[in-house]
Amino acid sequence: MSDFLPFSRPAMGAEELAAVKTVLDSGWITTGPKNQELEAAFCRLTGNQYAVAVSSATAGMHIALMALGIGEGDEVITPSMTWVSTLNMIVLLGANPVMVDVDRDTLMVTPEHIEAAITPQTKAIIPVHYAGAPADLDAIYALGERYGIPVIEDAAHATGTSYKGLHIGARGTAIFSFHAIKNITCAEGGIVVTDNPQFADKLRSLKFHGLGVDAWDRQSGGRAPQAEVLAPGYKYNLPDLNAAIALAQLQKLDALNARRAAIAAQYHQAMADLPFQPLSLPSWEHIHAWHLFIIRVDEARCGITRDALMASLKTKGIGTGLHFRAAHTQKYYRERFPTLTLPDTEWNSERICSLPLFPDMTESDFDRVITALHQIAGQ
C-alpha cells in the first residue's frame, strides 16, 4: 500500500547526492581518498588510533577473526541474541561458536555468562552492543585480560553509543555497520577500529587480496603495481561511492540520533498505558544510540502473540522488525547444537518486536503506531 509505514527508512538528502556526484566527477569511484577520509573521521569519532573501512560489518568480522588466527578447534564466545553473520564467520573458519545467554531485560551478554563459558580453547570474546546500548565493557575487558583472550566488540548497532563517557570503539577492536537500516548508512559497508597497528595492517591486507599495501595509495593516486600478495586474502574493500555517502551521513550523526532519542522517549511514555514491555536500560553510565526500539509481547500479559501483533500491524500498514530470532534456534544451529538451551534468550526471541524508528518518522507516523497498538491491545 502506498501509505505503508516501514520499520526503518534511511535519512538521505541533498548532502548525500552531492557527495556521490563529487566522487563520480572525480573519475575515481572505487576505493580511494574518500575511504581514507572516512577512516580518519571514525578515528576522530571513537578516539581510537586506526580504522579500516570494509564492504560490510560481516566482512570486518571475518577478517578480524582471521587476523586473530581463529581456526579449526578454536572456540569463540558470543551471545545467541545476535545476527547470524557472526556465527557464520566463526563456523566458516572451522572454529566452534559458543553461544551464551543474555540478561533477560536488557538483552546484553553478561560477564558472568561469558566467564562460565571460557575454556582453554577460547580464542575470542564477541560482546554485542544491542539495539544502540552498550555492553558492560569494563567487566568484559577485565575478563579478557584475566584469561588472555582478545575481545572484538560487535558495534553494528552502536554508532553514536557511549559507555562511561567514551564512544564505543575507543579502545581495543570494534566493528561498525553501515547497512541500510543502521544509524548511518551507505547502503552496505562497515568499518573496523583498533588500537593495534599490526592488527590494522593485517586487516588491510586481508580485505584486499592479501596484498602488502592498502587498496589505494595516496602518493601514487592508485594501487602500486608492484604490490605482492603476502597471504591469500579477500575482496572486502569499500568503494568511494559508498564511503562518500557514509561521510555525509556521519556529519549528520548527532542530529539523526537526537531525533531517534526523541522518538524513543515518546515510545517509552506511551508504553505506560500499554501492556507491551520495552527493554530495560543498562545501569551503567551510557548514551544510547537508539538503533532499535524493541518491545516484548507476552501473550499472557498482552492477550496476543508477537507474531499475531506483527501481522495485525501489517494489515494496518505498519511495518515491524524482529531483532533477532536467536541464532541457536535457526535450522543449521539447532541441528548442530540440539541440546543447547538459553532460557532468557529464548523467552525474548519468541516475544521481541522492533517498532518503526527512523529519523524522518513524523509525529503523524508515531501517532499512527500508538493508535494501532491501543486498538490491538483493546481487542
UniProtKB/Swiss-Prot annotation:
Keyword Transferase attached: yes
SS bonds (residue pairs): none
Organism: Salmonella choleraesuis (strain SC-B67)
The enzyme's E.C. designation: 2.6.1.87
Any one GO cellular component localisation term in the record: membrane
UniProt similarity note: Belongs to the DegT/DnrJ/EryC1 family. ArnB subfamily.
Primary enzyme class: transferase
PANTHER family (UniProt xref): TRANSAMINASE, UDP-4-AMINO-4-DEOXY-L-ARABINOSE--OXOGLUTARATE AMINOTRANSFERASE
Residues with PTM N6-(pyridoxal phosphate)lysine: 182
Protein name per the record: UDP-4-amino-4-deoxy-L-arabinose--oxoglutarate aminotransferase
Pathway the protein contributes to: Nucleotide-sugar biosynthesis; UDP-4-deoxy-4-formamido-beta-L-arabinose biosynthesis; UDP-4-deoxy-4-formamido-beta-L-arabinose from UDP-alpha-D-glucuronate: step 2/3; Bacterial outer membrane biogenesis; lipopolysaccharide biosynthesis
Gene Ontology biological process terms in this record: lipid A biosynthetic process; lipopolysaccharide biosynthetic process; response to antibiotic
GO MF term set: pyridoxal phosphate binding; UDP-4-amino-4-deoxy-L-arabinose aminotransferase
Biological function: Catalyzes the conversion of UDP-4-keto-arabinose (UDP-Ara4O) to UDP-4-amino-4-deoxy-L-arabinose (UDP-L-Ara4N). The modified arabinose is attached to lipid A and is required for resistance to polymyxin and cationic antimicrobial peptides.
Keywords of this entry: Aminotransferase, Antibiotic resistance, Lipid A biosynthesis, Lipid biosynthesis, Lipid metabolism, Lipopolysaccharide biosynthesis, Pyridoxal phosphate, Transferase
Catalytic activity: UDP-4-amino-4-deoxy-beta-L-arabinose + 2-oxoglutarate = UDP-beta-L-threo-pentopyranos-4-ulose + L-glutamate
Cofactor needs: pyridoxal 5'-phosphate
InterPro entries (alphabetical): ArnB_NH2Trfase, DegT/StrS_aminotransferase, PyrdxlP-dep_Trfase, PyrdxlP-dep_Trfase_major, PyrdxlP-dep_Trfase_small
Gene: arnB
